[in-house]
A protein has these predicted regions:
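A conserved structural/catalytic subdomain of Rossmann-like adenosyl-cofactor enzymes
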Residues: 2-225
Length: 225
């Protein structure tokens, strides 16, 4: 299955009926979004689509779902419960976070979830492609266009599970559990600290120069008072 569900829609008139009709099933296991006091058009209907797709998938079924990137780390009850089940059941095979304005009709940052009910991997593969692409004008709007080379890079890295610094990472499901079921690649990238070897003499000279600079700045500050 491939799905690009609407992210937000006013379904307040049918919300309670949906919850009641499926309350005895596992279709909407994480819950149905509440009706807000205002801006009913902002109801997150995509959360129902995700749960519906998971419910309908066959034992060997696969799905790719476009979601708002905020879903990857949201702490709200429904989003959290959905990610938790995906991780606990090992059906989240991977995630690709796309650049902003990749779709002309929405400025919402989007990511793609890849689900696999027959997944045998012990790790999910996460790609952060948000920095790729070139900004172009599209009428009154601005969107991001990926070059063929960038598209091929994303496909190659994701398909072959190639780990690249600050771009892709393979994360054990246990680690995802420890980090609150986050699907954000950036939270799992290795933090690298560069070390520069210098002699004690070089260190002392460096510190003396910094001290002299600070003294000069303080003196200048007093002159301006």
């Amino acid at each position: 299955q491939t799905a690009n569900p609407p992210f937000k829609l006013d379904f307040s008139s049918t919300r309670d009926a949906i919850e009641q009709k499926w309350s005895e099933t596992d279709r909407f296991f994480a819950g149905v979004p509440k009706i807000p006091a205002s801006k009913k058009e902002s109801m997150a209907i995509y959360l129902l689509f995700i749960q519906h797709i998971m419910y309908c998938m066959k034992d060997n079924g696969k799905a790719a779902i476009v979601v708002p990137t905020g879903f990857l780390t949201a702490k709200s009850k429904i989003e959290y419960a959905i990610r938790q089940r995906m991780v606990d059941k090992h059906i989240i095979k991977g995630v690709i976070s796309m650049p902003s304005n990749i779709f002309a009709n929405t400025g919402t940052n989007v990511s793609i979830l890849f689900l696999d009910n027959a997944n045998t991997e012990e790790e999910a593969f996460l790609v952060d492609a948000s920095s790729l692409g070139k900004k172009v004008k599209d009428g009154k709007n601005q969107r991001t266009v990926l070059s063929d080379e960038e598209v091929n890079r994303i496909i190659d890295v994701f398909t072959n599970r190639k780990v690249e610094d600050d771009f892709s990472v393979s994360v054990p499901y246990d680690e995802m559990t420890e980090k609150g079921y986050s699907f954000s690649a950036g939270q799992y990238f290795e933090v690298k600290i560069e070390h520069i070897d210098i002699t004690p003499e070089e260190f002392n000279a460096n510190m003396a120069a910094r001290k002299e600079r600070l003294t000069a700045l303080f003196a200048k500050g007093h002159e301006l008072e």
